[in-house]
Every structure is written in C-alpha cells, then in structure tokens.
C-alpha cells in the first residue's frame, strides 16, 4: 500500500527462549522479587499493632472453598525474620539451588530521605552477605490504611517524588 511500510524483525530461539536476532543469542536471567516486609518496624507497630509483619496477614488467611488449604504454613524456612543474617543466607542458597540468579529488592523510598523496610537490604550492603546478585525495584506508591483490609482509608505515608 502506498505510504505504508512493513517492518519485519528476525527472531531466533536460543535455549528455548525467543530473542531478537543479533550477533549472539541473549540469555534471560531468572530473578526473584524480594519483599522486605517480613520483619517488624516501628511504623507498622503504630499502624497495625506491635510486631506486625506480612506473616500477620498470612496467618489471617481463611479457607473459602473445599481443598483450599489456608492459612498456609511456610515450609523450609518457617515464619522467618529478615533481621536474621542466617535467614537471608538460607534464602540465597535456596534460590541458587532452584536456578534463581539474583534478588530484586523492593525499595520503599518515599522522598525527603524517608525509607521504610530498609534494614534487610542495608545489612546485605554492609556485610556483603549473602554474596548474591541483586537489583532494586522502587516501590513508588503511597501507603493507605485499606491495604491490609481495615476501613481506615487515611494516608499512612505519602510518596513524594
């Protein structure tokens, strides 16, 4: 058709993964999203009650239909606490065993220097352990009360960017 063009890109299959045709096949890396909410922080104590972590919500899960096994009790590492260096090392060891090549840490930076849930990542940086590749994923959203099922829809902490 006049005035129209068709672009065709070559594709190759490298180890079962489709990639754009180039000088060499690119390899996709398997990374795991790392949620740092599995340790207590003062803000969560204030908003949700002393000792709140994401495990609190796991324990509240209910069975809604036949064969719906809830709440699920975590296997292998149990109800771990990310303040414990051995837990973080065990997670990296397990990830490596199953072919995961790195963690993508959720990074809660709200602006004006305010960060939350930063302790596990800070300890990894300070100690260099576990020796496991990583990246950061900025969780750029404000927190409101309804996120955990309460009727309070007030702003808990605002994202300023």
Regions of interest found by a model, annotated:
Residues 21-161:
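Glycan-processing catalytic domains of CAZymes
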């Amino acid at each position: 058709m006049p005035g129209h063009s068709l672009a065709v890109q070559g594709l190759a299959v490298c180890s079962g993964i489709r990639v754009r045709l180039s000088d060499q096949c690119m390899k996709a890396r398997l990374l795991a999203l790392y949620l740092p909410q599995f340790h207590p922080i003062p803000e969560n104590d204030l908003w949700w009650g002393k000792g709140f972590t994401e495990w609190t919500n796991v324990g509240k899960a209910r069975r809604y239909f036949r064969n719906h096994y809830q709440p699920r009790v975590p296997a292998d590492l149990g109800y771990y606490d990310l303040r414990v260096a051995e837990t973080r090392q065990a997670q990296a060891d397990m990830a490596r065993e199953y072919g995961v090549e790195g963690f993508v840490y959720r990074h809660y930076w709200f602006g004006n220097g305010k960060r939350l849930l930063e302790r596990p990542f800070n300890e990894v940086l300070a100690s260099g352990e576990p020796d496991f590749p990583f990246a950061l994923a900025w969780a750029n959203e404000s927190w409101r009360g309804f996120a955990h099922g309460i009727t309070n829809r007030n702003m808990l902490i605002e994202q300023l960017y």
